[in-house]
Amino acid sequence: MGKGEIVQVIGPVVDVEFPLDKDLPDINNALRVTNNNGDTLVLEVTLELGDGVLRTISMESTDGLRRGMEVEDTGAPISVPVGKDTLGRVFNVLGDPIDGGPALGKDVKREGIHKEAPKYDELSTSEEILETGIKVIDLLEPYVRGGKVGLFGGAGVGKTTIIQELIHNIAQEHGGISVFTGVGERTREGNDLYFEMKASGVLSKTAMVFGQMNEPPGARMRVALTGLTIAEYFRDVEGLDVLLFIDNIFRFTQAGSEVSALLGRMPSAVGYQPTLATEMGQLQERITSTKKGSITSIQAVYVPADDYTDPAPATTFAHLDATTNLERRLVEQGIYPAVDPLESTSSALDPEVVGEEHYQVAVQVQHILQRYQELQDIISVLGMDELSDDEKLIVERARKIQFFLSQNFFVAEQFTGLPGSYVPIKETIKGFKMIIDGKLDDLPEDAFRNVGPIEDVVKKAEKMGVTPKNPEAKAMLEAK
């Protein structure tokens, strides 16, 4: 392979000159350079400046690099290990294990991280619902197996907690293979997640890839492709249904913005890179389901300053089948998960996909919550006394629905001291239908807070000294 030398180092950007009488490395090729400490660094070609000079982005710290050092072209893009050997392990952007475990053997298959998206005739469309066990998601914004889901929210509203709960529930209940990709997030969260998964026994079915906050922008920009390449292999070669978790897709955009500025490109709206839509499209179009297998992707999307019109979350919206919007005002009310039931959407909330009963219950829940939102202005000015009896009933049921949409998470047990709950879709529909039909009007609203299925509400109310009058609710007490 061709050899060149470093002519300039500016932070993570390294300019390399190759002889003009030889073929230059292609864009996206990986180059190798050994620094004074004997460590091998990987650079990725991003621009051709002319006269044999290529501009590259380093995947690691450029400390110790200097002009004149020899650089070798590997002749191919960055390649990462794929297949069963990746399960239960933690990798960096280059596919090197970072969990302190043994090195992978030389016979482990590797694939390049840059690929074309599947062709149209290879794609498959599925209408099967993926049960998550989280009531608010399963009822109002059901996830499609093989679809793309975005978890939108500002700082500290619970995006990572929901992702961790989804990994737990899906691994325990469905036993599928997961790939978790940590893009530019806190190293502590990745560490906690690793040990939680190890303790719960789901690590053996999960591959983890991290490029966290402390990494150079090149690594944070490419680590999403590393995780995706591992997931694609399970889909295309093993023919499996894979879950791909990305936390956080905004950091992918943010790293792209840093790289763009370092490369000297003119910034676009709000300082983002001019290639924002292209970069997002190249990643998202590869996350899809084919006739061989599926990738169901769940992506956390940080919303800067809670502004949904920011180009980063707005560009991501276009690629998603379902959105779960997390709202700060619900956090302030102590409702967890803080999912906004009126703003969250799903293309699968259709009677032909979820069934007539599920659809009708979901629509009625949304209608009651919408009416409650409209009545809140009157309540805040004139008080509850000015409402009609029907309106008072709507407010009471809406508050019960709002509280019943909350539940305890398994992954939060160590913080709350309360056991988590997994609620099947059938139980979720039954519970909300009973509230809508007025069968639980005599129960106090506090009984609906942070519980699992509707049986838990009835038992909690009894502990509070209230026995339900409805025969169906009474039967639940007798059944215990």
Curated annotation (Swiss-Prot):
Keywords: ATP synthesis, ATP-binding, Cell membrane, CF(1), Hydrogen ion transport, Ion transport, Membrane, Nucleotide-binding, Translocase, Transport
Binding-site positions, ATP: G153, G154, A155, G156, V157, G158, K159, T160
InterPro entries recorded: AAA+_ATPase (IPR003593), ATP-synt_VA_C (IPR055190), ATP_synth_F1_bsu (IPR005722), ATPase_a/bsu_AS (IPR020003), ATPase_alpha/beta_chains (IPR050053), ATPase_F1/V1/A1_a/bsu_N (IPR004100), ATPase_F1/V1/A1_a/bsu_N_sf (IPR036121), ATPase_F1/V1/A1_a/bsu_nucl-bd (IPR000194)
Reaction catalysed by this enzyme: ATP + H2O + 4 H(+)(in) = ADP + phosphate + 5 H(+)(out)
CDD domains reported for this sequence: ATP-synt_F1_beta_C, ATP-synt_F1_beta_N, F1-ATPase_beta_CD
Record EC number: 7.1.2.2
Superkingdom to which the source organism belongs: Bacteria
Predominant location category: membrane
Bilayer topology: Peripheral membrane protein
Coiled-coil features, chain-numbered ranges: none
Subcellular location: Cell membrane
Disulfide bridge map: none
GO cellular component assignments: plasma membrane; proton-transporting ATP synthase complex
Pfam families (alphabetical): ATP-synt_ab (PF00006), ATP-synt_ab_N (PF02874), ATP-synt_VA_C (PF22919)
PANTHER family cross-referenced by the UniProt entry: ATP SYNTHASE, ATP SYNTHASE SUBUNIT BETA, MITOCHONDRIAL
Purpose of the protein: Produces ATP from ADP in the presence of a proton gradient across the membrane. The catalytic sites are hosted primarily by the beta subunits.
Family: Belongs to the ATPase alpha/beta chains family.
Name the record gives this protein: ATP synthase subunit beta
The organism of origin for this protein: Lactobacillus gasseri (strain ATCC 33323 / DSM 20243 / BCRC 14619 / CIP 102991 / JCM 1131 / KCTC 3163 / NCIMB 11718 / NCTC 13722 / AM63)
